[in-house]
Amino acid sequence: MEANDSPHDVAVVGMGCRLPGNNNTPEELWRSILQKVDASSEIPRMRWEPYQQNAQNARSIGKVPRRGYFVKNLENFDAGFFNISPKEAEQMDPQQRLVLEVTWEALENAGIPLSSLSGSDAAVFMGVNSDDYGKLLLEDLPHVEPWMGIGTAYCGVANRISYHLNLMGPSTAVDAACASSLVAIHLGRQAILSGESKVAIVGGVNAIFGPGLTSVLDKAGALSSDGRCHSFDDAASGYGRGEGAAVVILKNMAEAVKDGDHILATLKGTAVAQDGRTNGIMAPNQKAQELVARKALDVARVDASTIDYVEAHATSTPVGDPTEVSAISAVYGKGRSPDKPCYIGSVKPNVGHLEAGAGAVGFIKAVMSVQKGILPPQANLKTLNTRVNWSEGVQVVQDIEDWPSSGYPRRAGVCSYGYGGTVSHAIIEKYIQTGPAIYSKEQWPKGTQVLLLSSPQRRSLETQAATQAEWMSTVGKQNDLRCVAATLGTRRSHHKYRAAFVVESHDDAAEKLNAFACQTPTKWTTSGGKPEGDDRPVVWVFSGHGAQWTDMAKDLLQYRVFRDVIESVDILVQKEMGFSAIQAMEMGVLNGSDQVQVLTYLMQIGLSEVLRSLGVSCGAVIGHSVGEIAASVAAGCITPAEGTLIVTRRAKLYRRFMGAGGMALVCAPLEQITIEISTQNVNNLVVAINSSPSSCVVSGPKEEIEAFALNLNNKGIKTIHVDTDIAFHHPMLGELMEPLAEALVGYVSPSQSKVAIYSTSASDPRSTMDRGIRYWLDNMVNPVQLTSAISAAAEDASPLAPIIKKILSMESRGATIQAIAIDISSHDAASQLSSRIDDLCFPPIRGVVHAAGVLHNEHVLSVTPDSFERVLAPKIAGSLTLNMLFPPKTVDFMVLFSSCGQFFGFPGQASYASGNAFLDALATYRRSQGDNTIAMQWTSWREIGMAAGSEFVRAELATKGITDISQEEAFQAWMHVSKYDVDHAVVLRSRALEKHEPLPSPLLVDIAIHKISSILTPPPTPPLSASSDLLPLPRNPADRFDSLSRQVRECVANVLQMETDEVASQEPLSNMGMDSVMTVHLRGRLQKSLGVLVPPNLTWSHPSIDHIVKWLMEKTNDKE
């Protein structure tokens, strides 16, 4: 059988749909098709209600066909899931809402986490041809709102998907009438093959909200009198309109194979054309339909005789069906024997004619047919159309049939035609896997599994659990529980709110999921929000000898990934050691210390790959004794084969010492045990491992270890025997160094580490020594410095680590850095500092920088003498101390770190501004004495300094259009200012620089005007809002906060059209759907409710309700 190996092939990896008859998944649609279900019904009562208000329209509506194929509860939409406010959702065409949800479902069906697509070149092409909802909204002129533009535009159907999923590839709505969605599939295939995109989201949508187009189609003779489709039937007289959405996920074939995607089918070729001038623009053209099919076959590079099934457009019109069947017969039926016809069918009698979405629905049906090997039966077919010649090699599928057997892969064609003349065709083929599956259930152990669910909203978890429970107890039983767990764990986006279920079977899973949905979770269920800081890199620590246990790795062998790793080096193990690692692990046998060393290493490298396959990675590695070999493999320093040679050849040499040595874990610090060894005169013992600050491991001859351990236990020092008969890391192993070096010559070629690696063999845990032969000789004999390695890793993860590295770098270049800790504001600070400087014997100090400060935000009326002094002390007393020690003209420069905050009058910073004003005055004084002193009035420094940790300060600066500066920019400003004879310099960074806009001129014009105005005229009494009966705010701070929080929540809820209890105080407003237009309305409501002037960028600088309330606390305090 031929394989899918053409470079023109595109993988179909996911599908989703929302169709009439509660067909909300492709599987539900398939079952409906097999059962010949006709999902037609009366139109929902409320759909045309707005048109009933006009008497003339109401009379005409009675003549419009009321039957068709409709989606129930089309008004339902989980707006919060997509961070869309209810207000904006109300003004979005339901077609946009529908494709958002179905696209999400299709991507989940594809097993593509949304995070993996964010920022990618993924394309979106969506067919759309109806704007019923837009007419309803935009023709109601008095109530037109800003969101109705994008909310009703065709482009919004595709663009919203790209926007909400953060996709950067092409994004286009496609209007080719009833061919729209198959044309979208064609464009998606082209985008992938051209290299423009790796993934394409394609499909179409239709929603019926007005009688206009239905009336047009009825008068044109396109609709059936009973609102049903009767494809290929002699009674066919038109179609029944259908609504819904169908979405298909296409992917570059090579990428899909590499990523281990579940490929549903292969898209071999597509073609799009126009039928030109015919008897009328809406009349079909048989020749054009034939030509586009032949073109698709040419693109697919397959012969028409290998196509066993064609999913026809088949709109049930008197002219359309005979024309299309004739075209299919001419292309696919020619030369076929009566017993091997080309089968045809159409999905329209099941779910209606979705017009712009019709082609994608037919495509989904055809994919499922080639995938399952079943030809599905035709619904609503009683008598074959007598206007068709059925003896020309085609046959309608009337009952469920197995796909005909042949010597080629199952292949199908899909037709879709638009009434404007667009004709389109696609060729699909069963996907044939040519190599071993990258991901399969064999990777996962049988038995207990963990099922993971997550959602952006807490309440949605219970709904998800109920849906999953129903699936588990029905169609989900056909799926291996291991595969279900793997998909939920590794091929889903993981959101803020999560739940995990430990399950033994499908029934057990359904029971626990249902219990969670009913808010009665069992003890084997856990849920909660995503923990903060869980994205920090982790350190993998590889244990040493003694951590082994019986049956170690036995269960892990059920993981395909783990077994592959062990099998890849098992031949080496057999050759070097004389036993099979696979067999030893399967039997759970550990024979001797030499075998334990090897199996411990193999266990570790296998487990590393299992973790990586589950998406777990490390930021650094540490190896304990023999664990350093596996750690080096995990870090990429050596290959698994090199590590195997090191551990096996060393293990063979260890055999010389087996039975002669021993080790003991002592629950006491290394320093204490070193003294014990000395006082007990057991000089053959050494501390081999510094395990932790409170424990260590002693190594030496067997008898002496046993006697030493007994003595320590008698003294009350707990000592535990280590399961080994070799004295690892003892000097006696020194005689093995030369033979080990000879055994490894030419077999180890170390590489640069791909992650941080901390040494436990070198004296410096951060040693960059390569993992060559010399390193492994040291690893065998040197003591294990585990405590030092862990401490180094912990230090390097600290925020101080970069600063320490900078200091060390400066010292390596000859600088001497000395920290002196004193209270610069104390009365004797000058004498303390002078004495300490003298002790250092430094050369004369030539420059001084004063950067001390305390930030304590407090309303001016709440300032106490103590709090005022606490803020002023480092500024005033500290600078006076330096002025006393280094009088004017005794140093080359003095720089005083002041702040720009005093210019802007930040609420709550009166004390801080006073302290900085003193620094400014001191700079002026020293300059007047001929000294080179300057006060730098800084904006916030990025990631350093007091303001860097203050969201309040950043937000206040942002209202002035000012951003923070990097350290590099700060020092550049400092160097620049030092060229001028000035006592003060204000350093600011305008946001205009980031937007490449011209700077405001003058930069601080608003401050200047404010200061001049305040001098010339008394401040006016601020007017109350139009509603002069503003509610007074409580004076108690806690009550005031609660009152403001309630009022802000009400304002936000009103703007977003949400219930007040649905508005989360700590959630960013943008996550609830607040956009730039809504912030204007919110600003107006806040000003009216609270009588406070609100800046235009309030929600940008104060992104949540809590942030806004904190800001209002300051502003309303100022009003008292």
UniProtKB/Swiss-Prot annotation:
Q: What is its EC number?
A: 2.3.1.-
Q: Could you tell me which residue ranges the Ketosynthase family 3 (KS3) domain spans? A: 7-430
For the region Malonyl-CoA:ACP transacylase (MAT) domain, what residue ranges are annotated? Answer: 539-796
Top EC class for this record: transferase
Task: Name the catalytic site residues.
Answer: 178 (for beta-ketoacyl synthase activity), 313 (for beta-ketoacyl synthase activity), 353 (for beta-ketoacyl synthase activity), 625 (for acyl/malonyl transferase activity)
Any idea which residues bear O-(pantetheine 4'-phosphoryl)serine here?
1076
> Carrier domain: which residues?
1042-1116
Q: Which PROSITE patterns match?
A: CARRIER (PS50075), KS3_1 (PS00606), KS3_2 (PS52004)
Q: Which PANTHER family match?
A: FATTY ACID SYNTHASE, SYNTHASE, PUTATIVE (JCVI)-RELATED
Name used for this protein in its record? Cluster 41 polyketide synthase
Which organism is the protein's source?
Aspergillus flavus (strain ATCC 200026 / FGSC A1120 / IAM 13836 / NRRL 3357 / JCM 12722 / SRRC 167)
Q: Its encoding gene is what?
A: fluP
